[in-house]
Structure formats: C-alpha cells, structure tokens
C-alpha cells in the first residue's frame, strides 16, 4: 500500500495533473472491518448540496442511503437522490433537522447502521453523537468527547493554551452574566469580537467597536446562536484588524494516526462567511505551512481525534504570527478544494474510518498537486448588504463538469430557495496546475454559470476573481471592505458599460424574434394558408416588416435610474434584423440570430459570431429576460405583450420597492421571521434606532428607523412571518406631520359640504400662513 501511494506521489510531482478521479476508483484502505462492522446503509442527517455530495460517494461504495426532509424539502434534490426518504417535521430547523430524536428514530426505522451529519445542524453536537452511540448507530464523525472538547470554543482554547498554542487575548469562561461580559470586554479593549462558543458559519458573530454597542450586540448574538445551534453561550476576543483566515484540514483514524492535508485560505468573506476559498494558501512559505500543519495535528491528538476535522487559525498579516481560533469537528463546506489538491475523497475516508479502517497513507505520502478554488454561489442581494434572497430558480444551468471542474449543488431548475435554510445555491470548484491557471478557469466558469429568477452573487464573485489584489493573492478578512469602491461602485468607464448593455439589448431583440418565428413555424396560428405572414422574415408587400420593442435594463449599479431602451427593428429580406436604438451615438446594428433550440442561439452581429443563451420568465406581472454571451450577462424587463409568451410565475412575490410608499415608510428587506419588536407603536425614536429584528436563513437583521420621529403602523409581532417588500412601519417626523395637518386644514377651509372647492376669496391658497420646512 505504501509503495502504491509513493508511486502516485512521484507521478503527481512529475506530471502535475488532476488525479482525484483515479484515486476515487482505487481502494487504498485495508480490509480491517469485520462483516458485523460493515456499513451497508447510511442515513444522511442533512439537506442540500452536502447531503447530495455524501450520497454520491456512498452510492459509489455500494452503500444505500436514507434522506431526511422537512415539509419545505419534500421535493428537494437530496430527497430524490436517496434510496429512501423520511419526513421528520415542519420547515423550521429546530422542529426537523435539529431534532435529534426524530433523526435517530428514522435511522432505526429504515435499518441504517450509520448516520452522517454533514456540516451544520447536528454535526457538532456531542449529545447527538452520544445518542447515536447509545442506540448502536455509527456516528460518521469524531468521538463525542472530542466534539465536546473542541466544539466548545471556550474549552478548546483552554486546551490549546495548556498545549502552548498561541491564543488571541479574550474571555473564554462559562459565566455569561451580561455585566461580567461587559466588564471583560472593557479589560480586553475595543474593538472586540463576540461569537458563540458552538457552531460556525459566522452565525452569531458581532464586531463591537464601542461599549455603547455591547449590550444589544451581545443579546443579538445569543439569540442567533440559540436559533442556529441550540446553545447561546458566548466568548469574547480581541479583534485583530488585519487578519488572514487560514485553516488546516486534519484527519485521524481509530488507531491513533493523525495527519494533515495542508491548508486552505478562507480570508475573503462577507457577513463573517466565506465566499471564495482556495488551497493551498497563497504567499505562504514551506516552513510556515509545516509549522501550521504540525500545530493542527498536535491539537487533534490532544483530544483523541478521529475522522475529518479542521483547525482554524487567525494569521496577523502585520506580525506574521498565527493564533489558534477554533476547531470544527466536522467536514467543512470547503473540503472539495482539499480533495482537488490531494486526490482523496474525504467522505470515503470518513466512512471507512467509521468502519474501523486505518488511514491509507502517512503524512510523508500526502501529495500536493496544483491549486484549487471554491466559489460559493448564493441567492442574495449584494447591493443590500448581502441580504439573503428567496424565490424560484426559473433558470439554472451550471457549467459543464470535467476532471478539473466540480459543481456541488442541492437544487435544480424550478426549485424554490426558501427563507428557512442557508441560501447557498451551489459551490463551484476548479483545479489548475498552479494558482494562475486555476484562477483563469474560475473566471471562465463563473461567466458561464447561469442562474435566473432571483438575485445571486455571481457577478460579485466575478469582480472578486478579477480584482488585482486577489489575483496577486493579497487577501485578508477585510478584503471586501477595503476594496469596496472597486467592488460596489459602477465602473469608471460608464459609457462602456452602457454600450455593453445596449449591445446585449440588440442581441436579445434578435434572439426573441428568432424564437418567435421558430414557434410560429411549428404552430402557425389560424388557417395555415396565412403562414406566409409569419415566415422569417415576415412577408410584406412593397416594404419590410417593422416593429418596436422596449426593454428596461436592470443596472446593478443604479437600480433607481430609468434605463429604458426603445429598439426599432426592421426585418430584412435576407433574414437579418436592422436594430436601431434611436440615438445617433449608437449606430444601427444588423443582426442575424439562429435559434438552436430551447433558449440557445447563434448570433452574427457586425461580422462577429457568438453563442448566446437566454432565460425568459414572468414575475411580478413583468417579463424578465436574462442574456449570457461571452463574459457578459445582462438582465432586462419588458411589459407583458405579444412579443413574448411564457407561463406566469405560480406565486406572486412583492418586489423591494419603496418608491410608491410615503417618505419614512420602512419595508421588509427580505422575507423572514420577526424575532423581536423593540419599541411600541407611537413611540418617539431617533434616526438609526433599532425598531425590530428579522431573522431569515438563521441570520439576524436589525431594522432601524430611517429618521427621527414617531413610529406609526407598527402592527407586526414577534413570531410573525413577513414577506419581502411588505410594509413594517413608518416613521413620521415633526415637519411632515405639521405640514400634513396644515394641508388638511387648508382643504377643509376651502371645501363646501359637498366637498367641492369654493371660490377663491380671502386667503391665498398657494401661500399658506405657516409652512415648516
């Protein structure tokens, strides 16, 4: 076995080619498991992409799988992917995916010998791992004792401190009295980081810059931690202002062997959640990598660890010192980038280690080949502070898979991204022979990844991948904040951006017309003898057929401005369309579009040929058209008319639009649950004062007063569901209230009993006696 691993290692160093597919088909483990220990059926206690990913490996190993699902996930992809599926409760996670008794009961009912927890939910619950063991079920993960020691971030820091691993200054005690915590925060010194002692994913984390913010931040972190992990204990740490987030993948077996599989850089984050990860970490020396790996292995051995785990470190970019942050006692979301560079299936390792088999290779035999990136594709409103989004995936076409491109997903076209769970749509994972090659592939795949129906972060990921600092590997956890002017502000060449949108609009028009003609040829209306009028180009006597099409460009940089494009289209005899925008600075373009089927087209414009894809659907009584061509993608809206004909969306979803509401009106920025109302209707508030707290996808969002004044129409209560765009309350300032009263008085003075205006007599209506500005 060792010779086989060495041979693979030598070949990798020589050829530098992706090899994980070969290794996934090669048995490297020994047959130490007895027949009574063998796992033949696994219940996956999770949902979404990780459940699908676990099932894929299990099926390759010939192991049957059982899915669990809530009412909201009845038709989910992970349910369809399993051999069996069991309903475990209503949509809220605390009543389904976090309900250990229901999951264990489902495993016993279906005859599963083991439970794989995935990540999140119960994956880091020592109690759940212990229940599995007590019921005779294999928990595919570390022992309950290790989860308890390392899953509790306070306890893990005490263990690491005793082992001599550097720690960030902070408070890791069990006493949670708010006055004590506030005192400890003062001792540490601001800014401080508040975070839950259990769980991960950035949930419950708060950066606090001053004592005035502490109480509300602390209570909010407790609520979010309780909702996400069922435990609300908190720890405090000094906030390092320029850190890198580097983590080490470790793996242990039940024979006491532990090794590391190198590090991942996860520094690029928003809302304390990673969005682009890579392995190995850029700009890291071999000595630093070795010291980091050794520290991670020592941490795992200190608690008798086996299975997959991740030791996370904060690296101070100023001093170069690394500090232990926490240990995640589970498989990480970003584990695929490690699999890509070491050529191992970590889920297979988990299953075999749970079966009692030793690790297949030693530390010296762990290969390191090439570079890998993972980009997390989320349903979220980037321009609204990355707030999670909900809606229907009207169009979903990931990139093509290959030996160097993976897509981990738990959704398919037509699915709904709900408010109950994490808004991740997919993980795009790419491999290259080096970082430059891998980054080129990442950019290309992002430009071809098609999602329509709800807002996503794909364009933002493209900006990140193309940023000069990211290209150079100069990353740290404040990357997005530091380069916000580059990432969020419109391109300096606004004219070029408008030109690209107009080109896309002309291509859309040509493709829509080509699609119409294809449909009319297949199903001519009325008497077939009239089909000449529906030919391509349409037949006309003594002139060319013309039409007008209006498209409204959805500009991600300026959603408030009107970007209405009026296109004049002339059908030419040779089958092309002459498309004019009505502006002299944009000349007419002659375009020919050939419908290839579905929503794919081949377009020729000004001597240039391009492949084009469209997505067309109806939402909010408006046609939405998305176009992808080359590295460009744009979105347009169109009033419903005869030009297009698609089925309407099944459910109406209010848009986030406050333009039609009076000044001071506050609408829900996302669909969610009201978890706390902080003031009463009629209360006087200051600008920026928190009014209520919304929770969606296990993340809290504080809704604040837009101005000083009185709160009116605050009718929502804690526990109430609200839809995206629904009115929550309004704040009326004194000025607007007085002006409104004067206006009403003026109308009353000049109206008769029949509410008709009386003749203008003594008072100048246009000049009231008093007007407060």
Where are these regions (language model features)?
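Structured core elements
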Residues: 43-44, 87, 116, 193, ...
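Structured functional modules or segments
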Residues: 657-758, 763
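Glycine-rich adenosyl-nucleotide cofactor-binding module
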Residues: 602, 606-611, 617-698, 702-705
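Short flexible coil/turn linkers enriched for glycine and charged/polar residues
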Residues: 186-188, 199-201, 227-231, 242-244, ...
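A generic structural motif
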Residues: 69, 240, 328-331, 381, ...
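Catalytic cores of soluble metabolic enzymes centered on carboxylation/carboxyl-transfer
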Residues: 296, 336-587, 690, 720-773
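N-terminal non-catalytic structural scaffold regions of very large proteins
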Residues: 312, 564-569, 573, 593-598, ...
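N-terminal beta-alpha lobe that positions the nucleotide/phosphoryl donor
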Residues: 2-311, 315-335
């Amino acid at each position: 076995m060792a010779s086989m691993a060495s041979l693979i290692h030598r070949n990798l160093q020589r050829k530098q080619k992706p090899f994980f597919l070969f290794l996934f088909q090669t048995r490297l483990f020994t047959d130490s498991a007895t027949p009574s220990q063998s796992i033949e059926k696994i219940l996956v206690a999770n949902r979404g992409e990780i459940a699908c990913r676990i099932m894929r490996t299990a099926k390759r190993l010939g192991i049957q799988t059982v899915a669990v699902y809530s009412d909201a996930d009845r038709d989910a992809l992970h349910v369809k992917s399993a051999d069996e599926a069991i309903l475990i409760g209503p949509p809220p996670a605390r009543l389904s995916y976090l309900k250990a008794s229901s999951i264990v009961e489902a495993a016993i009912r279906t005859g599963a010998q083991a439970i794989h927890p995935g990540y999140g939910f119960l994956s880091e619950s020592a109690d759940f791992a212990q229940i599995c063991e007590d019921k005779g079920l294999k928990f595919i993960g570390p022992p309950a004792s290790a989860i308890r020691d390392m899953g509790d971030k306070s306890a893990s820091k005490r263990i690491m401190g005793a082992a001599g691993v550097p720690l960030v200054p902070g408070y890791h005690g069990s006493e949670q009295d708010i006055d004590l915590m506030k005192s400890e925060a003062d001792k540490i010194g601001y800014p401080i980081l508040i975070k839950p002692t259990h769980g991960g994913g950035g949930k419950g984390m708060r950066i606090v810059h001053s004592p005035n913010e502490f109480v509300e931040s602390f209570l909010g972190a407790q609520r979010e931690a309780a909702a996400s992990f069922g435990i609300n204990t908190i720890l405090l740490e000094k906030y390092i202002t320029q850190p890198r987030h580097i983590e080490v993948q470790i793996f242990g077996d039940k024979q006491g062997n532990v090794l590391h599989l190198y590090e991942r850089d996860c520094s690029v984050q928003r809302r304390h959640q990673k969005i682009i990860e890579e392995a190995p970490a850029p700009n890291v020396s071999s000595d630093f990598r070795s010291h980091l790996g050794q520290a991670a292995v020592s941490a795992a051995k200190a608690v008798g660890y086996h299975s997959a785990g991740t030791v996370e470190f904060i690296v101070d970019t100023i001093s170069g010192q690394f500090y232990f942050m926490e240990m995640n006692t589970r498989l990480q979301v970003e584990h695929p980038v490690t699999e890509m560079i070491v050529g191992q299936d970590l889920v297979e390792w988990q299953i075999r280690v749970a079966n009692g088999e030793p690790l297949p290779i030693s530390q010296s035999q762990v290969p390191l080949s090439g570079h890998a990136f993972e980009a997390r594709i989320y349903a979220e409103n980037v321009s609204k502070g990355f707030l999670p989004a909900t809606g229907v995936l009207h169009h979903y076409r990931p990139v093509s898979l290959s030996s160097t491109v993976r897509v981990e997903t738990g959704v398919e076209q037509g699915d709904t991204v709900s408010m109950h769970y994490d808004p991740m749509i997919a993980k795009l994972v790419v491999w290259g022979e080096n970082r430059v090659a891998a980054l080129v592939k990442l950019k290309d795949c992002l430009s071809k990844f098609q999602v329509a129906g709800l807002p996503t972060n794909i364009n933002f990921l493209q900006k990140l991948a193309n940023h000069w600092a990211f290209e150079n590997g100069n990353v740290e956890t404040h990357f997005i904040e530091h380069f916000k002017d580059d990432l969020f502000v419109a391109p300096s060449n606004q004219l070029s951006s408008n030109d690209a949108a107009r080109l896309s609009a002309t291509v859309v028009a040509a493709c829509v017309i080509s699609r119409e003609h294809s449909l009319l040829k297949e199903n001519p209306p009325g008497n077939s003898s009239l089909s000449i009028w529906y030919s391509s180009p349409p037949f006309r006597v003594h002139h060319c057929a013309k039409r007008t099409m209006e498209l409204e460009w959805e500009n991600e940089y300026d959603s408030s401005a009107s970007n209405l494009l009026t296109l004049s289209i002339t059908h030419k005899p040779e089958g092309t369309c002459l498309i004019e925008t009505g502006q002299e600075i944009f000349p007419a373009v002659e375009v020919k579009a050939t419908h290839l089927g579905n929503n794919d087209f081949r377009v020729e414009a000004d001597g240039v040929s391009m492949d084009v894809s469209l997505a067309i659907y109806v939402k909010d009584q408006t046609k939405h058209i998305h176009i992808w061509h080359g590295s460009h993608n744009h979105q347009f809206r169109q009033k419903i008319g005869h030009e297009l004909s698609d089925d309407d969306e099944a459910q109406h979803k209010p848009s986030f639009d406050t333009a039609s509401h009076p000044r001071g009106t506050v609408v829900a920025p996302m669909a969610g649950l009201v978890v706390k109302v902080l003031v009463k209707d009629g209360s006087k508030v200051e600008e920026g004062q928190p009014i209520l707290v919304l929770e969606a996808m296990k993340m809290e969002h504080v809704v604040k007063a837009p101005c000083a004044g009185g709160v009116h129409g605050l009718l929502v209560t804690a526990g109430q569901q609200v839809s995206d765009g629904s009115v929550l309350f309004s704040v009326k300032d004194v000025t607007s209230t007085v002006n409104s009263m004067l206006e009403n008085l003026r109308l009353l003075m000049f109206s008769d009993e029949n509410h008709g205006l009386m003749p203008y007599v003594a008072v100048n209506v246009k000049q009231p006696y008093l007007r407060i500005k």
